[in-house]
From Swiss-Prot:
The keyword RNA-binding applies. It comes from Fagopyrum esculentum (Common buckwheat). HAMAP family: MatK (MF_01390). InterPro entries: Domain_X (IPR024937), Maturase_MatK (IPR002866), Maturase_MatK_N (IPR024942). Usually encoded in the trnK tRNA gene intron. Probably assists in splicing its own and other chloroplast group II introns. Coiled coil: none annotated. Keywords: Chloroplast, mRNA processing, Plastid, RNA-binding, tRNA processing. This is Maturase K. Belongs to the intron maturase 2 family. MatK subfamily. GO terms for molecular function: RNA binding. It is found in: Plastid, Chloroplast. It comes from the Eukaryota. The gene is matK. Pfam families: Intron_maturas2, MatK_N.
Length: 507
């Protein structure tokens, strides 16, 4: 990174074209490859066909040479089937450039983030990026609120609007022209910006699409900037490697001056709403202690804002008003709800006794058992009713590999759903995986499940349970065996940054 420092000086004007030259550096392509898949010199230098061809240094050199040509941009803009740069079946060059563009465009944002964080804030920033960092906040705040807005982010987005959005963080004109070129190419190939980022995981240019999506969502969230001035309890979380969240807060001073000067009526309308706000992937949740009428006004204000600012026709049915989470909401793989726990207190005053009935709101995070069973059925671990079946695709693996893969899935699920209020659904999912593993092994050895499990004994369950117990023991000291036995509260982890597919078997 030392050779790029000349381009990354903070005191340089944002109008200077200091980002585009990085695209012409061969080292930046190796850096992107290192971030995505782990640096492997043998792959970069390989000339074989297949997977490693995409990351060959020879391909990179040819790409850079073509970009130095004077008629390169003209040929690219006048796209035709004869153009060797953008060919529908051979879009290797455009894929490489899009990945590098995403990394380079994140540089100004990441530099602002690092310059704004100091001391402990920088150490705690990584923990705040964790998915599980949302739930302690929800437990402390949401149980005291009255209404919740469940919002689906509007989509799709026109390429010109995306370019205008990214202009707020990238001032390099050359990069913006290149971005416009790439966007029109992806639109011609049928790639559109969906409302859910999970759809991007199946695309080859995942980093580029994530960057576009987060830039767009960050601009959509500009409506919440002046609301944060009215309520200091606003919280928000980012998704993926994009660091737009802090950049969103850095725009506060400018927006507050504008809204205070020109939007006094709006500020009075939203006076002290006591708002809590979180976002993940394609969904927003906005909670307030205000009345139902106030939340309805919020709903139509959002619709008008997105329609006027982004030219998006957002239907009101995409925004749901939930009264204090009486109806569960699906969010980040959990089902969120607030349950009223009744309690009775007996009061004795002289000869008179009174019974006082109190209701205490308790925030619950439940495991979506039926959704998980549907995912397992789709991956052929069980049927639609939840009855375990064998996994034929893994029957050719060794016994240790089969047990290791099933065990890893159980540990990942236990890790992610460690903070759930009720573990019954999680135990059912683990039972399905454990019995599916036994059926797969029995199918491989042409034996019955009972005979095979009897032969393995307790060693078969070690992969599923013991390693999970070791993780818990790191949190609760081994010396405090009584506290570990009595503790029944949720355990949240701050090392979970994305949700992997259930069938993932990568280390």
């Amino acid at each position: 990174m030392e050779e790029f420092q000349g381009y990354l000086e903070l005191d340089r004007s944002w109008q200077d074209d200091f980002l585009y030259p990085l695209i012409l550096q061969e080292s930046i392509y190796a850096l992107v490859h290192n971030q995505d898949l782990g640096f492997n010199r043998s792959i970069l230098l390989s000339k074989k066909k297949g997977y490693d061809t995409k990351y060959s240094l020879l391909v990179v050199k040819r790409l850079v040479i073509r970009m130095y040509q004077q008629n390169f941009v003209i040929l690219s803009l006048n796209h035709s089937n004869k153009n060797a740069f953008f060919v529908p079946n051979k879009n290797l060059y455009s894929q490489r450039i899009s990945e590098v563009f995403a990394v380079i465009a994140e540089i100004p944002v990441s530099m602002r983030v690092m310059s704004s964080l100091k001391g402990k804030e920088r150490k705690q920033y990584k923990n705040l990026q964790s998915i599980h960092s949302i739930f302690p906040f929800l437990e402390n705040k949401f149980s005291r609120l009255n209404h919740v807005l469940d919002i689906l982010i509007p989509h799709p987005v026109h390429p010109k609007i995306l370019v205008q959005t990214i202009r707020y963080c990238v001032k390099d004109i050359s990069c913006l022209h290149l971005l416009q070129l790439l966007l029109y190419e992806y639109c011609n190939n049928g790639i559109t910006l969906k409302g859910s980022v999970s759809n991007f995981s199946k695309k080859k240019n995942q980093r580029f699409l994530l960057f576009l999506y987060n830039s767009y969502v960050c601009e959509c969230e500009s409506i919440f900037v002046f609301l944060r001035n009215r309520s200091s309890h606003l919280r928000s979380t980012s998704y993926g490697a994009f660091l737009a969240r802090v950049y969103f807060y850095l725009k506060l001073e400018h927006f507050l001056k504008v809204f205070t000067k020109h939007c006094r009526v709006i500020l009075q309308f939203f006076k002290d709403p006591f708002i809590h706000y979180i976002r993940y992937q394609g969904k927003w949740i906005l909670a307030s202690r205000g009345t139902f009428l106030l939340m309805t006004k919020f709903k139509y204000y959002f619709v008008n804002f997105w329609q006027c600012h982004f030219y998006l026709w957002l239907q009101t049915r995409r925004i749901y008003i939930n009264k204090s989470l009486n109806q569960p909401i699906d969010f980040i793989g959990f089902r969120l709800s607030v349950r009223l726990n009744p309690s009775v207190v007996r009061s004795q005053m002289l000869e008179n006794a009174f019974l006082i009935y109190n209701g205490i709101k308790k925030f619950e995070t439940l495991v979506p058992t039926m959704s998980l069973i549907g995912s397992l059925a789709k991956e052929k671990f069980c049927n639609v009713l939840g009855h375990p079946i064998s996994k034929p695709a893994w029957a050719d693996l060794s016994d240790s590999d089969i047990i290791r893969r099933f065990g890893r899935m159980c540990r990942n699920l236990s890790h992610y759903y460690s903070g759930s209020s009720k573990k019954g659904g999680l135990y059912r999912i683990k039972y399905i995986l454990r019995l599916s593993c036994a059926r797969t092994l029995a199918r491989k050895h042409k034996s019955t499940v009972r005979a095979f499990m009897k032969r393995l004994g307790s060693e078969f369950f070690e992969e599923f349970f013991f390693k999970e117990e070791k993780v818990i023991s790191l949190i609760l000291s081994r010396d405090s065996s009584i506290s570990r036995r009595l503790y029944r509260g949720p355990i949240w982890y701050f090392d979970i940054f994305c949700i992997h597919d259930l069938a993932s078997h990568n280390d």
